[in-house]
């Protein structure tokens, strides 16, 4: 990309220099040509022969002016050499054109130099592939058949737009990577209209623990409010934001006092949105890392059972949502990786522990749909490749610890950083040695 910009700037610089030189020369050439075209009138050539007549004529005019009323008439050289008005106007116009063109050329040169200086001052960034690249499949261990593109794994419908792979480093957990959809920017839908399994979608929330605003958090709010409106339930964005913030702050206080334990409240008694709410904290925020680097409330995960009136598409297989907060990308690598791992432990731990509750035993969560956490507004200066590696390490740690037996579904992200990170972990994975 930098080479392309450098070629463009060089072309602009050369064009500006050439334009300035040409306009300066053009202005002087126009002035000279106009000067050469100004010729004396035909009567001037015979001025020496008619000099006597002219003197006599002036004498008569002087005598008439002496005896005439009013001020004497003035004479100028224009009486002998009349100036051509069209030639003078053309000369002035050409001078203006030359000055304007010269100024434009100088402006182009200065703009090119300014852009070149700004480009050199910016730090280099990691290139991001604009399209979804074909990536080789992980090598399956002996005795295990490796899935191919033409033959997806058993039980996976042959639908274009996603890829499902089992990963040995994740205890053969199936991971689905969605391709671009027909929606704006190719984003994956939060929930499917007719799902074949119960999916809990992760909301990449904010440090203040409310649902709403922009990005994915705002999309969750719009989905809930639209379902409420369809069922004639009065619910505004402000009310949803305040209600979700109050419930999640209350849950967080309980979860921080009992890390590693799923806490719950019967939110259905006072909430228009949530029938039941849970929270899980694997590592208490701000104990292992500094919140001034990562942001507040990182590592906490909230699991909500939505009421039927606000469930997406009105399908009860879509009535579970997860809410978490990703670390800020500008944090140091050590703090970022620890906080990211705690975030993934919170997500997988919350689902694993929920499936052991009476609610989960009746209607367990079968899949977790999540974005590449931290790749949006919280990304900062961190490259997507770095986020993909942190995600792979965190997912591997969470699956190894909880073994939730659920499918992971990564939403579409153009760089495929989640897929690349897990493929790298799969290549470097070492099989545990038997006794």
Swiss-Prot record:
Vacuolar topology ranges: 21-96
Task: Please indicate the ranges of residues that lie on the Cytoplasmic side.
Answer: 118-435
Q: Which UniProt keywords apply?
A: Membrane, Signal, Tachyzoite, Transmembrane, Transmembrane helix
- Main subcellular localization, coarse class? membrane
Q: Which residues form the signal peptide?
A: 1-20
Residue segments, region Disordered: 120-159
Q: Where in the cell does this protein reside?
A: Parasitophorous vacuole membrane
- The answer, when asked if rRNA-binding is one of the entry's keywords, is no
- Membrane-crossing ranges are 97-117
Domain of life of the organism in this record? Answer: Eukaryota
Q: How does it sit in the membrane?
A: Single-pass type I membrane protein
Q: Which GO cellular component terms, listed alphabetically, does the Swiss-Prot or TrEMBL entry include?
A: membrane; symbiont-containing vacuole membrane
Query: Whom does it interact with, and what assembly results?
Result: Interacts with host SAMM50.
Summarize the protein's role. Answer: During host cell infection by tachyzoites, does not play a role in tethering the parasitophorous vacuole to the host mitochondria, probably because it does not bind host mitochondrial import protein TOMM70.
Q: What protein name applies here?
A: Mitochondrial association factor 1 form a1
Read off the lineage from the record. Answer: Eukaryota, Sar, Alveolata, Apicomplexa, Conoidasida
């Amino acid at each position: 990309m930098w080479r392309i910009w450098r070629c463009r700037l060089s072309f602009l610089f050369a064009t500006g220099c050439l334009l300035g030189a040409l306009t300066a020369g053009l202005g002087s050439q126009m002035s000279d040509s106009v000067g050469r075209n100004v010729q004396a009138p035909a009567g001037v050539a015979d001025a020496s022969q008619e000099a006597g007549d002219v003197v006599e004529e002036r004498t008569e005019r002087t005598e008439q002016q002496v005896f005439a009323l009013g001020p004497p008439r003035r004479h100028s050289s224009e009486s002998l050499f009349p100036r051509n008005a069209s030639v003078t106007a053309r000369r002035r116009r050409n001078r203006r054109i030359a000055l304007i063109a010269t100024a434009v050329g100088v402006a182009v040169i200065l703009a090119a130099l300014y852009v070149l200086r700004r480009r050199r001052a910016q730090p280099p960034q990691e290139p991001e592939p604009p399209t979804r690249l074909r990536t080789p499949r992980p090598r399956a261990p002996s005795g295990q058949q490796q899935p191919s593109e033409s033959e997806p794994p058993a039980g996976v419908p042959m639908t274009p737009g996603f890829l499902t792979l089992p990963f040995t480093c994740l205890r053969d957990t199936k991971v689905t990577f969605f391709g671009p959809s027909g929606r704006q920017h190719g984003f994956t839908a939060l929930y499917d209209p007719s799902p074949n399994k119960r999916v809990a979608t992760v909301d990449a929330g904010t440090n203040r623990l409310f649902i709403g605003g922009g990005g994915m958090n705002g999309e969750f709010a719009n989905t809930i409010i639209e379902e409420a409106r369809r069922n004639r339930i009065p619910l505004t964005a402000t009310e949803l934001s305040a209600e979700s913030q109050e419930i999640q702050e209350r849950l967080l206080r309980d979860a921080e006092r009992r890390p590693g334990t799923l806490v719950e409240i019967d939110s259905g008694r006072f909430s228009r949105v949530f029938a039941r709410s849970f929270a899980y904290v694997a590592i208490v925020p701000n104990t292992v890392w500094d919140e001034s680097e990562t942001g507040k409330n990182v590592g906490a995960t909230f699991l909500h059972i939505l009421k039927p009136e606000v469930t997406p598409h009105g399908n009860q297989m879509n009535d579970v949502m997860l809410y978490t907060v990703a670390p800020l990308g500008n944090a140091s690598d050590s703090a970022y990786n620890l906080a990211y791992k705690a975030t993934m432990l919170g997500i997988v731990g919350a689902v694993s522990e929920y499936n052991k509750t009476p609610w989960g035993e009746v209607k367990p969560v079968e899949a977790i749909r999540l974005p590449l956490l931290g790749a949006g507004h919280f990304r900062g200066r961190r490259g997507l490749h770095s986020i993909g590696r942190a995600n792979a390490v965190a997912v591997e740690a969470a699956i190894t610890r909880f073994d939730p037996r659920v499918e992971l579904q990564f939403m579409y992200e153009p760089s495929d950083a989640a897929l690349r990170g897990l493929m790298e972990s799969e290549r470097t994975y070492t099989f545990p040695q038997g006794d």
